UniProtKB/Swiss-Prot annotation:
Protein name: Archaemetzincin-2
Annotated PROSITE patterns: ZINC_PROTEASE
Transmembrane regions listed in the UniProt entry: none
UniProt entry tagged with the keyword Zinc: yes
GO molecular function annotation: metal ion binding; metallopeptidase activity
Family: Belongs to the peptidase M54 family.
Binding site for Zn(2+) 1: 254, 258, 264
Biological source species: Macaca fascicularis (Crab-eating macaque)
InterPro entries assigned to the protein according to its UniProt record, in alphabetical order: Archaemetzincin, MetalloPept_cat_dom_sf, Pept_M54_archaemetzincn
Amino acid sequence: MQIIRHSEQTLKTALISKNPVLVSQYEKLDAGEQRLMNEAFQPASDLFGPITLHSPSDWITSHPEAPQDFEQFFSDPYRKTPSPDKRSVYIQAIGSLGNTRIISEEYIKWLTGYCKAYFYGLRVKLLEPVPVSATRCSFRVNENTQNLQIHAGDILKFLKKKKPEDAFCIVGITMIDLYPRDSWNFVFGQASLTDGVGIFSFARYGSDFYSMRYEGKVKKLKKTSSSDYSIFNNYYIPEITSVLLLRSCKTLTHEIGHIFGLRHCQWLACLMQGSNHLEESDRRPLNLCPICLRKLQCAVGFSIVERYKALVRWIDDESSGTPGATPEHSREGNGNLPKPVEAFKEWKEWIIKCLAVLQK
């Protein structure tokens, strides 16, 4: 195992900058917010720790990238920021996300509520779910895993056409595996920062995906034409467990973070670290390090205290926490299902520690 440990001065500069304008901006932050963010360069901090690499296949080792400090983020000419008339994040479900209509709709509401808390201050809106056939995307059966896959690039084109006028971004979510091109095995997600669109799959987050008993294998792809989507009528969907919900929330917020202009984090253990495989993704925390937190706060303009309180409320709320957020047709049928948040309890304790620092 390798530990990436930066010096106090390096972390301080990455967070605050040496640019007098950005230093002044930092000094105008709430005293509690400065106190929390200063934990970034406190060696004894129990809130923010160094990045640990466990194998040569981990992201930082296999995908060398230049780090992005706050000043580089702030000065990025290609970075998009929400404006008063484009301040909504739209979520588009593609295909069913649960084994019943109620489970699918509740799961979407849980994800929506989480995004509302994570990107506190932005509007998060649901679009009516669409079947795979509506996207007109290419698809295949993966030769190695024998599971169905849809073409990520085709989905991005579909989402770009559907993007509402008031959207900062539109993100597609699906339980069907993705591939970006014929030569690739799979991809967890793909986004276009310039177009403000992204597509993310949670298919590989089920507990059985990598097991011999995985039920999503398709023996042979039978289609009469490229427009025959009947194979998706009963595709396999894993059970929505607490771990799958946690993994989904991580991926969704990580990828939307990229649309805000946050690059992969190389400073401290952080949600914005890259991940090359599921084990590495599971190691990533749900939280942003102070450097990435300052970036997101700069882009969105939230109070850190209120954001953390909203996240605690989402964990504590047994139902969706997003009243009125579901499409009209979904209000028929039985009520809310219990939200499986067991996997989030440790993170809740961490947030409460942060709130104690913020509210001293």
